[in-house]
């Protein structure tokens, strides 16, 4: 993703876990340039409230591109009266049709506490099969760990924190400085 345009930039692991009537979204704080950590406390998980409809979003890829997408998502949510899936599909349509948006290099995980979706860099909207999804440089590590931890009785936040710790131990572009947001319907 962002690595295509800026070969040396790396960073971000975002994980979402749905369990027990809530969704927890966790993101690490590391941004790296090559072998150098530029920032260890970046905040890549945000709470949005367009029109009073609460949504939590985590992003990976280009930060400027992600903020552009988050702004557009907020507008789509207002227009869709808070219907997250509809707003995301409309955003994806724009992403695919608009010349400017097609060049954006970011991915999003979004949830309203019930619906959990990934919006890919290609403009696809995906719903995870196993109540767990992840994006970013350490996403596969976090996803594998979280799927294994879902076999336990741990609450969603603990699954997310433990899985992110495992990802941070494996992925050099992921740290243990987490931002965690919880949302339920």
Swiss-Prot record:
A double ring-shaped homohexamer of HslV is capped on each side by a ring-shaped HslU homohexamer. The assembly of the HslU/HslV complex is dependent on binding of ATP. Its EC number is 3.4.25.2. Keywords: Allosteric enzyme, Cytoplasm, Hydrolase, Metal-binding, Protease, Sodium, Threonine protease. Na(+) binds at residues 168, 171, 174. SUPFAM superfamilies: N-terminal nucleophile aminohydrolases (Ntn hydrolases). The keyword Metal-binding applies. It holds the Pfam family Proteasome. InterPro entries: ATP-dep_Prtase_HsIV_su, Ntn_hydrolases_N, Proteasome_sua/b, Proteasome_suB-type. The active site is at 12. Gene3D superfamilies: Glutamine Phosphoribosylpyrophosphate, subunit 1, domain 1 (3.60.20.10). Allosterically activated by HslU binding. Protease subunit of a proteasome-like degradation complex believed to be a general protein degrading machinery. It is found in: Cytoplasm. This is ATP-dependent protease subunit HslV. CDD domains: protease_HslV. One of its GO terms (cellular component) is HslUV protease complex.
